[in-house]
């Protein structure tokens, strides 16, 4: 039967080998609360081992999108897993949750044990950065749906917060200040536009080093998404963070207003933080308006916190003590949506 299945495009033995290779990466993500080991039908986690009095589970799921196409082109697969974890754990973090465990779903055109191990290595790296245990997942070989070199990855994160410490944004008021945490670059959003502007229309080469970068363009674009969990949780535990936003698809314009109560808006001081060079590089090559850039990309700020004015210095000090670079990027005002002060948008 296995020979017939292999002739149909599914290599069971390669799948077994991939599982063997990923075990050591899974094991280094273990944490308090994990029950059982890799290979069960379901991942188990004992919440009673953690010191929560009224725990509320907060979950999130996401993928990496068409950033994967660049990984295929570069044949570089060891950081895409970090992106998959980051997109999920940063979302649950925005509600004040401590990520507990993570599951991944990997669909491949052909089971290549070495490539699968590289992908899962990245997932485990992301789990370590976020304090999450990788307690399960699925790797599906799907010939005919994906080409031999293609795959897709998605993840699912579950976190926990004390019921009376969940960060919902409901306590944000006019006058709250906005703290921005720097991104590592594009993160995992807007890559359909990136590929069109730089590769399809621009004809640029992923293996070439362009000014102002110090490495090939493909490596610049594949820089993994930052994971903000550990420093931000330190700030959240102070009780002085009233709202948070993960700046993902939709950029500033869609994501920052998501944390605000009705009747309030965000005024952003454009120019109050350094914008990484990948963004003006992309804007110049695509002749994109700045408003569109802020509506698609993170523009150098991957996570935003809302705090009272009197708490600003303390929260920034806490974040920077954890190695974060934090900027005062704006404030909350009456109104709807988002506006930009400082340097005008073009």
From Swiss-Prot:
UniProt cross-references to CDD domains, sorted A to Z: PurM (cd02196)
- Show the GO MF annotations: ATP binding; phosphoribosylamine-glycine ligase activity; phosphoribosylformylglycinamidine cyclo-ligase activity
Main location per the UniProt record = cytoplasm
Q: Which UniProt keywords apply?
A: ATP-binding, Cytoplasm, Ligase, Nucleotide-binding, Purine biosynthesis
Superkingdom of origin organism: Bacteria
E.C. number: 6.3.3.1
Catalytic reactions on record: 2-formamido-N(1)-(5-O-phospho-beta-D-ribosyl)acetamidine + ATP = 5-amino-1-(5-phospho-beta-D-ribosyl)imidazole + ADP + phosphate + H(+)
A Gene Ontology biological process in which this protein takes part is: adenine biosynthetic process
Q: Which Pfam families match?
A: AIRS, AIRS_C
- Any S-S bridges, and between which cysteines? none
Q: Does the keyword Magnesium apply?
A: no
SUPFAM superfamilies, per this entry? PurM C-terminal domain-like (SSF56042), PurM N-terminal domain-like (SSF55326)
**GO cellular component terms listed in the entry, alphabetical order:** cytosol
Q: Where in the cell is it found?
A: Cytoplasm
**Which pathway features in its UniProt record?**
Purine metabolism; IMP biosynthesis via de novo pathway; 5-amino-1-(5-phospho-D-ribosyl)imidazole from N(2)-formyl-N(1)-(5-phospho-D-ribosyl)glycinamide: step 2/2
| Gene3D superfamilies, sorted | PurM-like C-terminal domain (3.90.650.10), PurM-like, N-terminal domain (3.30.1330.10)
Q: What family is reported?
A: Belongs to the AIR synthase family.
Q: What is this protein called?
A: Phosphoribosylformylglycinamidine cyclo-ligase
Natural source organism: Bacillus velezensis (strain DSM 23117 / BGSC 10A6 / LMG 26770 / FZB42)
Gene label = purM
